Amino acid sequence: MYRRILMAYNGTREGKTALVEAAEMTGFAQAETHLLSVATMPSSMFLTEGFLPEELIDEEKNRMQEVLDEGVSALREKGFSVTGHLAVGEPIEEICRLARELGCELIVVGHHQEKSFAARWWKGSIGATLLDYAPCSILVAIGRSTR
């Protein structure tokens, strides 16, 4: 049984699937559970001077705080004792950093599975990249493409 779990949550359908699947697994409710939402700043948002206005950063942090609060509430309704964490940065780096810092034994993420190879290649995958850097086991909840 896992004693400490980190769930990465971004509010997408796949993220919600991951929350539900983890909540339904026997024994997860007894684990020390942490929910992480990461406010990311896409490179397209950077201005020509190479920085982001503070207002844009604050907007993204506020948006992700709402997503985090939603996820924490959903898990608490299912009987979890959960601690929420908000980070700013690249999702892979922040997920791995917090998992190491907390000594997690499992990371739970959602993943949108594309049907076409070109779509998978173009978008990349947090789940696949996470496999290369995670300090512990990973549970990937799959959300299949409806196209």
What are these regions (language model features)?
Residues L52-E66:
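A short acidic, glycine-rich active-site loop
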Residues C136-R147:
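Short, flexible loop segments at boundaries between secondary-structure elements
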Residues A39-M41, H112, R144:
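Residues in the short beta-alpha loop(s) of Rossmann-like NAD(P)-binding domains
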Residues V109-D132, R147:
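Glycine-rich, Arg-bearing micro-motifs that act as flexible, cationic patches
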Residues M1-F51, Y133:
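Small/aliphatic-rich secondary-structure junction motif
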Residues G50-E54, E101-G103, S125-G127:
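Short, hinge-like loop/turn segments at secondary-structure boundaries
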Residues H34-L36, T83-A87, L139:
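General small-molecule cofactor/ligand-binding pocket signal
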Residues S73-I107, S145-R147:
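Structural beta-alpha unit
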